[in-house]
Amino acid sequence: ELVGRANAKLLTVCTFHAFGCEVLRRHLWRLGYPKRFAIADASDQLSLVKRAMRETKIDDRSFDARRVLALVSKAKCAGVVPEPKPEGMGDEYDLVTAAVFPRYQLALKAQGAVDFDDLILLPIRLLREHPEVREELVERYRYLLVDEYQDTNRSQLDLLVMLAGERKNVCAVGDDDQSIYSWRGAEVDNILSFDRHFPKVKEVRLEQNYRSSQAILDAANAVIAVNEARKPKRLWTARGL
């Protein structure tokens, strides 16, 4: 209603993963995958990890395949390839994950499949390795808005930076104090260091709260103030005590 039907049709509203999936539907063949690909579910992923463990002579009775899969996913969210850590650092699971990762990826590709994390990683690879794809997407998406920015991971940030191109027309909405998903890869530093990735940023603080009483907000302000690694803000309300 605000922008009109014609302009509304020009908008793309979706999650990071839905966006990545659409990019892959159009361009994944450029990376040697079939034009029609499948998205592996949790059961498929676990099966492929167990196969990779057998191929590398790793006993799945000694190492939990589910934990290995979780570490593979964690690495993908961070945008890194698991590698053996220097002696004295890490543990045996780091070594197992580093050994399993390449075989797991090859097994996915051999089946014409990607996993959920690949919906972010493979579009990044496409943009890096195929300038024509990057130019097309940067031109198509000139303005980018990301909600709940404190919940983004490193791979999502990398994709956003590449899509923003030289224009860097990015609006992020989020609250570092509400970052609670680090256990699944979210990095609060993405919002804390926003101005490093997108210079000349204008910051707008939305400190008025419409849900809680001032007594609750005072308690919340006191608790969160202990955290030194945050954007300074103080919530208030017009609702009274």
Describe the predicted segments one by one:
Residues E1-K35, I39, Q111, R134-E135, ...:
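P-loop NTPase Walker
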Residues T12, A38-D44, G90-S193, R205-A215:
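Conserved helicase NTPase motor core
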Residues A18-F19, S73, V201-K202:
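N-terminal helical cap/lid subdomain that shapes the substrate entry/recognition surface
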Residues E22-L28, I180-H197, Q214, D218-N221, ...:
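Short regulatory helix/loop adjacent to the ATP-binding pocket of P-loop NTPases
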Residues A42-L108:
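Coupling/switch/interface segments within P-loop NTPase motor domains and analogous charged loops
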Residues D60-A70, P82, P86-E87, V204-L241:
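Coupling/hinge elements of helicase-like and P-loop NTPase modules
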Residues A172, R196-P199, T237-L241:
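Short, flexible turn/loop "capping" segments at secondary-structure junctions
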